Amino acid sequence: KVPHHRTGTKWGVYPMYDFAHGQSDFFEGVTHSICTLEFEVHRPLYDYFVDLLKKVEPDHEANYRPRQIEFNRLNLTYTMMSKRKLLQLVQEGHVAGWDDPRMPTVCGLRRRGYTPESIRGFIDKIGYTKYDGIIDMALLEHAVREDLNRRALRGSAVLDPIRLVITNYPEGQTEEMSFLNNPEDPESDSHIIRFSRELFIEAEDFMEDAPKKYFRMTPGQEVRLKSAYIVRCTGCKKDADGRVVEVYAEYDPETLSGRPESNRKVKGTIHWVSATDSVEAEVRLYDRLFVDENPAEAGKEKSLSELLNPDSLRIVTHARVEPFLAEAKQGEYYQFQRVGYFCLDPDSRPDHLVFNRTVSLKDTWKKVNK
């Protein structure tokens, strides 16, 4: 009988939400109404209206009594789940839309390469509780790594390419080598990679004056080219600005992967692609959208723009990938060796490949932000 603060006693259905909630559940056959924790205080009114309906509608065919059950809302670190805040991100142009791979939306996660199985696996692991908490984003990333490790095709991609010349390898010669699509799947096929005199390696895999515990390519040191030969670095070439533009090495013909001599102890292994038949691709490296672990709480004192991670997207425009990736399709998943898990973006075209990083191979965020 308490009057509504605006309409007074004109309508006898106040509070409207509580009246409608239980009534619609009763008549529509809803047995369990699952709500988040803020609705717990509404449950007495929900029960009151349902019990009242059972009395005033004794002939109703329902042989059940709807129940309201509350559980915690899903909150992730470095993420905002509020639709109002997500809308603000879209409207202010901080993201490319609701399906931006940094958004915690279903379409955003799909575009980034998250599988339905990985999301369900994550939900199964965290369960639900009766108190509000915040789940570490690393758990979601672990779930997708675990799933993609089983299903992703392995391939090589060099994001920051530098030319490697094998000086004692015959010019014009090419070798075909077999590469397993997925070592985790005994039934998976293999694909061919071509080895030649000139390759591309990651620029960070070469250092001219390397520290003692640097096991990748440096003058005088041996390194294994994955699935190929052991090579010894002999030097490099620089441009007028002092930047390394070519690296030189000599290979040992007896160390082809699978031969007895290939078991020689070499501490460093790096990936590569052929300079002649690799294809160019754009690679989008996504990371956490916010720098604060709990942006919803931090947002009470800071503006949304102050909380954004300026490095949440880095675009690599001239990466080189294996030629079979030119036939990549949406809905397929790939592991770029030593780099991370990737999928083809809808922006991709036959003449301009675009790959999105789903997640890195390891959780580097905590290591960097310690």
Regions found by a protein language model. Give the residues of each.
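Auxiliary tRNA-acceptor-end handling modules of aminoacyl-tRNA synthetases
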Residues: Y286-D287, E301-L304, F324, Y333-V339, ...
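Short acidic (Asp/Glu) and glycine-rich catalytic loops that position anionic groups and cofactors
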Residues: H21-T31, Y64-R67, K85-L89, A96-M103, ...
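Active-site cores that bind ATP or allylic diphosphates and position pyrophosphate for catalysis
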Residues: K1-L86, V144, L153, D160-P161, ...
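Flexible, glycine-rich loop/tail regions that form catalytic "lids" or insertion modules at the edges
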Residues: A62-R110, D132-I134, N149, E261-N263
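A conserved acidic, glycine/proline-rich C-terminal tail/linker
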Residues: P310-Y334, R338
